[in-house]
Amino acid sequence: MCTRVATLLVGLICLILVPLGVQGKDAPVHIGFLVDNLKLERWQRDAKMIQARAHELGAEITVKDAGGSDDLQLQQANQLLDDGANVLIVVAHDAEKAAAIVQAAQRKGVPVISYDRLIKNSPVSLYISFDSVQVGKLQASHLLSIATTGNYFLLEGSPSDNNAHDVEKGQKLALRQAEDKSLITIIDEAWCRQWSKKEGYDATVEALKKSDGKLAAIVAANDETAGGAVQALAERKLAGKVLVSGQDADLPAIVRIIRGTQAMTVYKPLGPLAKRAVDAAVALARGNTPETTDKVSSGSHIIPAILLQPIAVDQKDLGATVISDGFHSAEEIKKALNPGEWEKFTSRKR
């Protein structure tokens, strides 16, 4: 009798010591993928790749689109946890408010991966992204290599997104020396909460008024805001005359690069990012520790991280990057252009 009671007690203690969300070695894994806003082409691509990798590994996955709402994203997280998700991958809408998602997951012993946007002041299990400071450096240094003097306008992402601040940091690091030498002047800076085309347009209209149309370059944080900037420039017949950067290698941005109205974009190969995120999610759900490359501070905690390197892309690099990787096919780009534009572009490159 005593032996039986002791055995039961040992078993109970073992159950208590195992985190609630952790699965056995071969147990099925249910991944919850919480996305800020699936209206953006960038997140649509991530979602498809993450789903595909999860299926390859035999994991169940549920994707939730918050549509840019913090409250909805928290509701969706709680629903996924109630439905038995044993690991969450989160693209946070607000880096601070998403801490509530981590707290909810902790209560159920479920690990959380911050995907491409670091959740602030929270003990997330892993942060996986591209080096956002390097993104900003690539954007600004590329424009500065062409427009070595003149007025610069910084068009940033969301003030609630840690990545946006890192991108801004990289931009300013790249521009600092030229600014200190009075070669360039940063005439204004605007933040776009939704990283949207409309916000980019509105902010650029104001910058053009403030500078009386005298801009050398617009360091736009992503391709959506860049699209708005180019639209505002076009209305003043300045598209192609004022340099514009971007990020994400969205198809409309590739079209603008070919047409010469956007100088460059920063390409982030999403396949490796999605693969490593899902692989790490499955490992964490099974109680294992994924391999990492870096450590970052969330403000309150030091977080293990996987940081991949971004790539600057302009007209001369399209074939060797986004096309050769299959991110966009030549046929897809050709269809997005007007008749004859692709042929003219490719013949010019020969």
What are these regions (language model features)?
Residues 1-3:
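N-terminal secretory signal peptides that target proteins for export/translocation
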Residues 23-350:
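A residue-level marker of the well-folded mature domains of exported/periplasmic proteins
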Residues 7-19:
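Bacterial N-terminal signal peptides
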